[in-house]
């Protein structure tokens, strides 16, 4: 073992050892308990960022800890390789997406290896290869044959200038990002998978996910959005078909004063056909894409269609308005409006001078006032005819029953969740395996003709997908008849919805090998960002249930335990230029002055300009405040970067990047290395004789085993990695001060250092590997996690604090089994106690067993 800790000398050597010995390559072993640890796989954007490093370090720490518990641990890695950024980069760099993607994979793979992550590289795959997406295509055709896939027209963002479909992220302020043309909404046929068929099960099974953060489960519950309500019909004057609406508040039915419909509703389209003003308004609504979250705050706009709806119970006629807050994608595309009891309806009614009729009053008898805002609480009905006096649930049931009896409505369960639209009008994705024959019939591509391969040698013009532009590519046959291929590709969430399962058998000649999949699944620990709570995590749960129902897996859920790591923040600095826009300056190009409390007082960039500090914000390219992991590894070594990542903050909280903190982690590792080097240089160590230890030696050994117990619990159960590292640091402070004179001093230090090195191994595997060998052991990768000796925690002596009139005046060392009388006697005889009690009369002596003697005197 070299005297100085120089990571650059050891890390590559240890990584080569892992590669040569295939240390992390695993197979199914029915005799060992398995542990499947997975971090969300990266998109190969070109370089790793600190968010990646944090995510993968957490996963690696958990994996290595579980290995040392004797488990058969699988930790795979791969590449989520399809997606829009590759198309954009290809246009910019005048290349095709495929070579750009594969080059990035090679570069990032090398970065992951330099960080020392213990991956089973034999399981690696990229989702953009036919070997992967072929099985996705086949599974899709199976779902189609089961009736779980369908095609319907749906709205997309359309650029009329480029004649192309835009992804949501390509629409900037309602305009095309490329040519600044106002974007329109266009309806085109798209493919959907019936996730709604599984809505109730997806909701119910959240209750089985005890290892998931409550916040993520709540987000999914809200996203699925189960509600119980009533579906009812309003007759429309002059129309044959009634207007269907869904409401969760049938108790307010007698307060309906208008009906709102979406711009895309058939009634709106029919009315607009003969009304130019209404047509212009519906077009405006259609081309203003509104997120559901914005509905509450946006300006409410509407226009009377001239149509009248007939109230299903009292026969009153109410106007039908096209309203911009009603979305065609939700419910029936129509809402019954009760301004007195819904704030959105209230604002709209106030704006357009519509009636506001209250029908619910507070249950407590307090005065009802709807002069300034709606009364939205549940209460008691009035002015509602036969339903007067009923409270919410009774009114709900009675009104639903009456509607049902008259054939005008029924109780129903509704979900906010919509079927999963998987069509994308992009090139760089897996082709959807469907064909259309000349008679207009749609068919799945037969299994023996899969995969439908995406051509990789293409030219990107930045406007049209190459497979849409190449008319020859789409030409094929079906049962000998001419046919055209589907030129849309899958939503890239398709690939990431089942990748975790493919790792179990990446070479299988089917989507999965059930035997291998059922050995490894479900994933025991999943690590990734909370931003994936409602899309990726929900789609993966859905896909798992589809795989189960197809007979591939036996478990109901894909991920047992979920850890959502916090974001990585860094200082951000900007300079406001002559045009008044902010130029973001990299923190590495800024010299800062701090005040006594460490706050930034002044910041000067490398051009000598004073720049503004914008605070600690998420590392991003746009704010130019990302720190390159490569630079940090080159400067400090992978182990130091990993240690800082795990120590600087709880794993699920934001982490503030401070290079001073990285320097602190480096100093700590050097101290551990130095002590191990000094200890091993003194030669062989005799066996530890626990029975012969002195009082001080026993106390130190107690600290060692208390630390083992705490670190085991912090990493294994609580996942508070930062407190585990803090406990190891605290122990190291004691070991650095411990005597090394006697043979048993050295034997005790040997036991302690071996425990420290193994406990640090999940965070700092390279340094631990070297120190473990120096301590005379072989291959830390197959070592066993230290077990704490319960007997070491038994104390022969206890320290009792003596308080006199609330002030600490003495400390007593007493036998662990000393009685209350013995402690009181020793306390009153203590020379410090005698000094402070001189001239006072003792009024009370209170003993808190094993801790405190409290004397009250005056």
Swiss-Prot record:
One of its GO terms (cellular component) is cytosol. GO terms for molecular function: aminoacyl-tRNA deacylase activity; ATP binding; leucine-tRNA ligase activity. ATP binds at residue 621. Its EC number is 6.1.1.4. It comes from Photobacterium profundum (strain SS9). CDD domains: Anticodon_Ia_Leu_BEm, LeuRS_core. Keywords: Aminoacyl-tRNA synthetase, ATP-binding, Cytoplasm, Ligase, Nucleotide-binding, Protein biosynthesis. This is Leucine--tRNA ligase. It holds the Pfam family tRNA-synt_1g. InterPro entries: aa-tRNA-synth_I_CS, aa-tRNA-synth_Ia, Leu-tRNA-ligase, Leu_tRNA-synth_edit, M/V/L/I-tRNA-synth_anticd-bd, Methionyl/Leucyl_tRNA_Synth, Rossmann-like_a/b/a_fold, tRNAsynth_Ia_anticodon-bd. A motif ('KMSKS' region) lies at residues 618-622. GO terms for biological process: leucyl-tRNA aminoacylation. It is found in: Cytoplasm. PROSITE patterns: AA_TRNA_LIGASE_I (PS00178). It catalyses: tRNA(Leu) + L-leucine + ATP = L-leucyl-tRNA(Leu) + AMP + diphosphate. The gene is leuS. SUPFAM superfamilies: Anticodon-binding domain of a subclass of class I aminoacyl-tRNA synthetases (SSF47323), Nucleotidylyl transferase (SSF52374), ValRS/IleRS/LeuRS editing domain (SSF50677). A motif ('HIGH' region) lies at residues 42-52. Belongs to the class-I aminoacyl-tRNA synthetase family. It is an enzyme of class 6 (ligase).
């Amino acid at each position: 073992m070299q005297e100085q800790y120089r990571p650059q000398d050891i890390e590559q050597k240890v990584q080569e050892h892992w590669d040569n010995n295939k240390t992390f390559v695993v197979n199914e072993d029915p005799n060992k308990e398995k542990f499947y640890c997975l971090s969300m796989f990266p998109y190969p954007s070109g370089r790793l960022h600190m968010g990646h490093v944090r995510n993968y370090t957490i996963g690696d720490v958990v994996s290595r800890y579980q290995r040392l518990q004797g488990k058969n641990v699988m930790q795979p890695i791969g590449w989520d390789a399809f997606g829009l950024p590759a198309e954009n980069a290809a246009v910019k760099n005048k290349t095709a997406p495929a070579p750009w993607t594969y080059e990035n994979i090679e570069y990032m793979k090398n970065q992951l290896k330099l960080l020392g992550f213990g991956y089973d590289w034999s399981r690696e795959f990229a989702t953009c290869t036919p070997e992967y997406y072929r099985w996705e295509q086949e599974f899709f055709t199976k779902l189609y044959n089961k009736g779980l896939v369908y095609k319907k027209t749906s709205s997309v963002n359309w650029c009329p200038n480029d004649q192309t479909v835009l992804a949501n992220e390509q629409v900037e302020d309602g305009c095309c990002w490329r040519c600044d043309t106002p974007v329109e909404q266009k309806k085109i046929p798209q493919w959907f998978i019936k996730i709604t068929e599984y809505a109730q099960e997806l909701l119910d099974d959240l209750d089985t996910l005890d290892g998931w953060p409550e916040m993520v489960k709540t987000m999914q519950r809200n996203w699925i959005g189960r509600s119980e309500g009533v579906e009812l019909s309003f007759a429309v004057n002059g129309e044959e078909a009634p207007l269907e609406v869904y409401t969760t508040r049938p108790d307010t039915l007698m307060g309906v004063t208008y009906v709102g419909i979406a711009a895309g509703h058939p009634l709106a389209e029919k009315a607009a056909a003969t009304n130019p003003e209404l047509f212009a308004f519906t077009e405006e609504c259609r081309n203003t894409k509104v997120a559901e979250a914005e509905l509450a705050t946006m300006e409410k706009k509407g226009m009377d269609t001239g149509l009248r709806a007939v109230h299903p119970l009292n026969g009153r006629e109410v106007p039908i308005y096209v309203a911009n807050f009603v979305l065609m994608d939700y419910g029936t595309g129509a809402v019954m409006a009760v301004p007195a009891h819904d704030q959105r309806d209230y604002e709209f009614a106030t704006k357009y001078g519509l009636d506001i009729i209250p029908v619910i009053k507070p249950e407590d008898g307090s005065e009802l006032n709807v002069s300034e805002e709606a009364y939205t609480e549940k209460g008691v009905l009035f002015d509602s005819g036969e339903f007067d006096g009923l409270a919410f649930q009774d009114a709900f049931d009675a009104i639903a029953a009456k509607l049902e009896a008259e054939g005008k409505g029924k109780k129903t369960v509704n979900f906010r969740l919509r079927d999963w639209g998987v069509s994308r009008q992009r090139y760089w994705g897996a082709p959807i395996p469907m064909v259309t024959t000349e008679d207009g019939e749609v068919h799945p591509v037969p299994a023996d003709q899969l995969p439908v391969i995406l051509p990789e040698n293409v030219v990107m013009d930045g406007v049209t997908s190459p497979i849409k532009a190449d008319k020859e590519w789409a030409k094929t046959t079906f049962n000998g008849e001419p046919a055209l291929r589907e030129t849309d590709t899958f939503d890239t969430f398709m690939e990431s919805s089942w990748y975790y399962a493919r790792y179990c058998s990446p070479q299988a000649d089917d989507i999965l090998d059930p035997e291998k999949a059922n050995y490894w699944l479900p994933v025991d620990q999943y690590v990734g960002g909370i931003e994936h709570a409602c899309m990726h995590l929900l789609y993966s749960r859905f896909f798992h249930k589809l795989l189960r129902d197809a007979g591939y897996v036996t478990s109901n859920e894909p991920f047992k335990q979920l850890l959502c790591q916090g974001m990585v923040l860094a200082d951000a600095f900007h300079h406001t230029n002559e045009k008044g826009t902010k130029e973001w300056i990299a923190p590495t190009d800024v010299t800062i002055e701090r005040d006594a409390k460490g706050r930034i007082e002044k910041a000067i960039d490398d051009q000598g300009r004073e720049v503004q500090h914008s605070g600690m914000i998420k590392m991003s390219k746009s704010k130019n405040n990302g720190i390159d992991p490569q630079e940090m590894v080159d400067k400090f070594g992978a182990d130091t970067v990993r240690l800082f990542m795990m120590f600087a903050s709880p794993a699920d909280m934001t982490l503030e990047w401070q290079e001073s903190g990285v320097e602190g982690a480096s100093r700590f590792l050097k101290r551990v290395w130095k002590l191990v080097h000094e200890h091993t240089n003194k030669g062989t160590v005799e066996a530890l004789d626990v029975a012969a230890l002195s009082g001080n030696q026993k106390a130190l050994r107690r600290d060692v085993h208390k630390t083992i117990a705490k670190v085991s619990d912090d990493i294994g159960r609580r996942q508070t990695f930062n407190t585990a590292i803090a406990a190891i640091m605290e122990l190291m402070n004691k070991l650095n001060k411990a005597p090394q004179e006697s043979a048993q001093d050295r034997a005790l230090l040997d036991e302690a250092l071996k425990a420290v090195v193994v406990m640090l191994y999940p965070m700092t595997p390279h340094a631990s590997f070297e120190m473990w060998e120096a301590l005379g052991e072989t291959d830390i990768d197959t070592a066993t996690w230290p077990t704490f000796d319960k007997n070491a925690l038994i104390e022969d002596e206890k320290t009792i604090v003596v308080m006199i009139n609330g002030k600490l005046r003495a400390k007593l060392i007493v036998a662990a089994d000393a009685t209350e009388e013995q402690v009181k006697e020793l306390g009153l005889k203590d020379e410090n106690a005698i000094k402070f009690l001189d001239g006072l009369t003792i009024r009370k002596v209170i003993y808190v067993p094993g801790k405190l003697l409290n004397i009250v005197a005056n």
